[in-house]
Amino acid sequence: MATFKDYLSAFVYVLFPDACLACGGVIEQGEKTICSVCRVSFPRTNFHLDKDNMLAQKFWGRAKVEYAIAYLFFKKEGDVQSMLHYLKYKDCPEVGTLIGNWYGQELLENDFYKNFDVIIPVPLHPKKLRKRGYNQSACFGEGLSKIWKIPQSENGLQKVTHTTSQTKKSRQERYENMKAGFIVRNPEEIKDKNILIVDDVVTTGATLEACINLLLESGAKTVSVAAIAVTQS
């Protein structure tokens, strides 16, 4: 039997319906943040079905990656970009967690998650983290962690401040400079572990390349990558 609170909630919803953070349309009562239409229609990559997918190929000859997967394809001016804009710039960390939940659930059926021991997010610069208040990649990782029951080490990697200008540097020098911008906080935590490093959007993969190689050099057994989205080149 419906209570007064139920009727009040329905009345408030009619007056002030929530908007989907992807398409901007009205979301139904009971839906969270993203409407069911967007959830169904988002451009999925299905990279978990193809180990030699386009994201994995970005790292060929650059970093030894066990698996490289992304949930969605990123397209400028598309609904995925709109959703990620809210995640990164509009104080909506719940978007990252929700997407992590969805992706984690979709990968449960083939036991893909059993390949990993620890989830580590790509870190933000400390100043950016203080300004934003959260790491969007860690929000995504939190969503995966809750579904897969795998721990996330939010500070497993840290961004430090002593990188120098990339101007006039060779590609190798730029790479070494970028890698010097990260540290492994506790090498014992990752030693002989199968690490899943998570990111929001992958473009060139340069940042991930530096993080992957640093983790391997610090004792990780394997390193894999999972991202919310990847750009199509």
Which residue ranges define each predicted feature?
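Glycine-rich phosphate/pyrophosphate-handling loop used in enzymes and phosphotransfer proteins
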Residues: 1-199, 203-233
